[in-house]
Amino acid sequence: SDSDDCLRNRCPQYNNCFYFDSRRQADKADIIIVNHALLLADAASMGMILPSYDLLIVDEAHHLPDVATNAFSLSLSNRGLRALCTKAIKKVSAPAGIIHEIESQGFAFFQHLNQSSTYARTRVRKPIEEAAELADTLHLLKRWLEEQTFENYLDVDQAREKAKLKAKSIVSTLNAYLTLLDYLANPDPNWVIWIERSDLSGSRIAVVAAPLDPSTYLRNQLLEKDGLTSSVWMSATLATVGEDPFDYFKRTIGLDKVIQSQVPSPFDYAHQACIYLPQRMPEPNQKEFLPRAADEIERILEVSEGRAFVLFTSRASMNAVFDMIGQNLAYPCMKQGDMPRLKLIEWFRATDSAVLFGTSSFWEGVSIDGDRLSCVIIDRIPFQVPDDPVYEARCDALKEDSDGRSWFKDLALPHATMRLKQGVGRLIRTSTDTGMVAILDPRMTSKAYGRAILECLPPMRIVRHLDEISLPAKSKLSMR
């Protein structure tokens, strides 16, 4: 059996089933540990996955808005539609005529999507008429399934029951597809819709709808969950710029009536680390920036004797700088993509004076303590580029906001602050670590928002000249 035709307590193997035995143990447990994806999948399913709970503690809570956006999203792909048709024929003997009509309308629908999209992800801004035509054929299958009693399964009651469960599962998938197609035919301003394709041929193409503001769903299906009396949200990067450092996070997940607190770090940042902000760097949008950044990175690595993460906001910038200096460095050097992520981390830990060039996946979730990592170099303030349809739509909504909110102040800036704090946080992992963070973006000092971001970073000494930093004979960086 699979989840579609599981008979649950009517199955003769129910008492021996690993899944239900795990569920029974979870029901008895005082503490249940799950990841963010499972927590939000339970919320999206209206509590059908996890046992009831009265206290929720969420670590690394800054991820919740993005996880929630994914959890409450809807998706329809050409491969998914084909799989549904195959399932309907094999599992419940759906009429060939209806399936043929779905396949025909589906082909026309996805062909239109492929011709309408010019990028890997293309936002949909206008109604798509073909969506209504595909929806009409899906309704035919749904009505047929809802009318079936499966009385032809006369030999085995269990087979009839499994067929009913399969039909119910297919109807559930159809309902999700029909909701998405309705958003395509009749756009809803509260939803963001885009087309994704794997290549120009459209061998895999999908349309996705995501909530513009997931806080409504989080509030209704998680924060106000029956039985939940209180919740705790923790992260080293929740606080951002502004009078209320937690305002951005509270807005994105729908929190109110909170008791909030910033707990001091156990690390002595003033003595363990410094932030190097080089002078006279070009603006990041100037063509001179990357060559100057490459020169500055070489100088910094000479001081740190390698032992560095060099973090970029884009793969293109990483590759460009690596091509400029990677072969000339006096230290073992690799970049993201040279091998799988975990292998790169293992290589870094095992290699003396290693230098690792990386992008988004190395900004967080990597912990290198001790002498192996003495320096973290960041190319620029990590403002999100507006090629993400959800981010673009949220910026557009704030530009039209009548409450005086700003897309930059209320979205772009706090998001970048959180991201920068994550990158900076790679350096000091224990009370004995020391080292240097270098941020090559001149806006950290030339712009008011850059100085505001700087105030949100750990209280490290600010250094403007590399000769203010000296390297002890053994180990890590110290400040004169």
List PLM regions with ranges.
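ASCE RecA-like P-loop NTPase motor cores
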Residues: 1-480
